[in-house]
Amino acid sequence: MRWRCALLTWIPLSVGLAGALTLRQGDRNSAVRVTIYEDLQCPDCATFQRMLDEKLLPRYGAKVVFEHRDFPLARHTWARKAAIAARFFQGVNPELAVTYRRYALANRRQINAANFEERLAAFAKDHGVDPQKAVAALQDPGLDAAVEKDFQEGVARGVSKTPTVFVNGAPYIETFTFEELSKALDAALVAAR
């Protein structure tokens, strides 16, 4: 499988809150904004991630900004830890954060609560990051607060399922097609001219 390159940036949300970063892919200056509330243990989020990588970013990455938000569902035993780990990797390198998110989603059937830290340490080591620091980051209150901030923002916007994707404020919930998002993005791009 070939991955297309997308512009990745991170932007601090507030000074002093460790890990409080918004992970953005695509054109960060675009007037058209896609906000993605995701759970890294969610099968529908894994399907959406493939759509994002294979269709949305190649077609819209130069024209639209895609912003990731963490929304770990309580029923998923390791989703919150995965969100915290993704925030840790984001502080190391935004591209590594995207790689970790892809990894967690692609390997969600092999990862479980019992082996989560072992899998996290192996991922870190494979990507040149100190495994002990990656595992220790799971206890970082700043990273946890950043995940919680995203979660509470999602709750305030009515998010209860993942993925929930907002295209310029209009929600697409859990299962939707590329064609539905493409139509909304095309209309938003025309309106933004």
Name these PLM-found stretches.
Residues 38-40, 46-125, 191:
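Structural alpha/beta surface segment adjacent to cysteine/selenocysteine redox centers
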Residues 33, 63-65, 164:
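Residues at or immediately flanking beta-strands
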Residues 1-4:
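Positively charged n-region of N-terminal signal peptides that target proteins for export
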Residues 15-19, 158-161:
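A short, compositionally biased
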Residues 27-30, 58-61, 78, 156-160:
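Extracellular/periplasmic catalytic domains that process cell-envelope and extracellular macromolecules
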Residues 19-32:
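A short beta-strand-turn-helix
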Residues 6-16:
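Bacterial N-terminal signal peptides
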Residues 37-39, 50, 121-193:
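C-terminal cap of thioredoxin/glutaredoxin-like
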